[in-house]
């Protein structure tokens, strides 16, 4: 849960909106949680990368990969946690919320 909290801290620092955490344990063999969030402005997307790097250094976790720099969808792979940070339009287009609508949500704020 520490990794999830760090990811949420980074998103909140970037003023992300409509943050949802989908529990994909036992459903997806590659990661346990997927975070979906919306950026109010495109410049927030790239700010997330810097903020996640700061959180990673501070909390001692590794960023496996980060893709989508300069696009409208940033995907950050934190091993067991994936962050999907979209513009509003891209989030509607790809609609991960619909794809994972049958999966449980982790409530915010995250408790230890």
For the regions a language model picked out, list residue spans one by one.
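Long, contiguous binding/interaction regions
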Residues: 1-26, 40-47, 54, 59-73, ...
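A short, glycine/Asx- and small/polar-enriched loop/turn
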Residues: 29-32, 77-80
């Amino acid at each position: 849960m520490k990794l999830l909290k760090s990811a949420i801290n980074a998103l909140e620092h970037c003023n992300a909106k409509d943050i949802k955490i989908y529990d994909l344990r036992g459903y997806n063999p590659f990661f346990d949680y997927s975070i979906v969030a919306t950026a109010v402005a495109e410049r927030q997307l790239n700010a997330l990368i810097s903020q996640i790097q700061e959180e990673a250094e501070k909390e001692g976790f590794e960023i496996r990969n980060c893709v989508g720099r300069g696009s409208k969808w940033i995907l950050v792979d934190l091993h067991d946690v994936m962050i999907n940070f979209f513009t509003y339009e891209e989030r509607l287009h790809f609609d991960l919320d619909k794809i994972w609508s049958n999966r449980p949500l982790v409530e915010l704020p995250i408790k230890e």
